[in-house]
């Protein structure tokens, strides 16, 4: 398999600041899992799409690959600056991070378009079968991906435990990018280096294999499919 398929630099888009993006695999030691105290679920005042209550149980059970959780990691909260868009594949623990110019819907959607081009238009909905997001306004356009065959679900407000894997991965990223430190201080290459270190760690829950190894096997299966569409 061509390993570069998993973490190639995203192409620069003409006339915008996305040149510093990089598609990056992250993963983390399961031993660092923190217990989340569940809170009372509040009513959702915003409706960006399908609720997580309608998500098939098979996705939570991690029976198959291709189901993701999405989030953003911010630096300084004041002012406009870059953030990191992160996704974790639930079965393999494979983590993707993309540096984007801001915490807004347009930046998120351009990043997802980069991913669609990266993995291939014909295979995008096979690699990304579903994505579960929170109700942040940066994900307000995420349901547009359903046009490509991706199922989009939204967690309840103030219910981070419904995306526990992504939350855990983001906490590990904070070892490298502490809270309050600007994302602009880190290049795409530095973020990739952080990711490579974490990605190389075997996991007990994965049979002492790495997320990268398992995700590459998943991609091999996807790209071996005969898709006539």
Predicted regions, residues:
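Conserved short alpha-helical interface segments
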Residues: 1-41
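Short small-residue beta-strand/loop micro-motif enriched in glycine and branched aliphatics
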Residues: 93-98, 154, 179
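C-terminal domain-tail junction helix/linker
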Residues: 179-229
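Mobile-element integrase/transposase regions
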Residues: 24-84
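RNase H-like two-metal-ion nuclease catalytic core shared by retroviral integrases
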Residues: 133-135, 139-145, 154-177, 184-196
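Short, structured coil segments at secondary-structure junctions
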Residues: 147-149
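Mobile genetic element proteins and their domesticated derivatives, centered on retroelements
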Residues: 71, 87, 93, 112, ...
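Active-site beta-loop-alpha junctions of metal-dependent nucleic acid enzymes
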Residues: 76, 80, 97-122
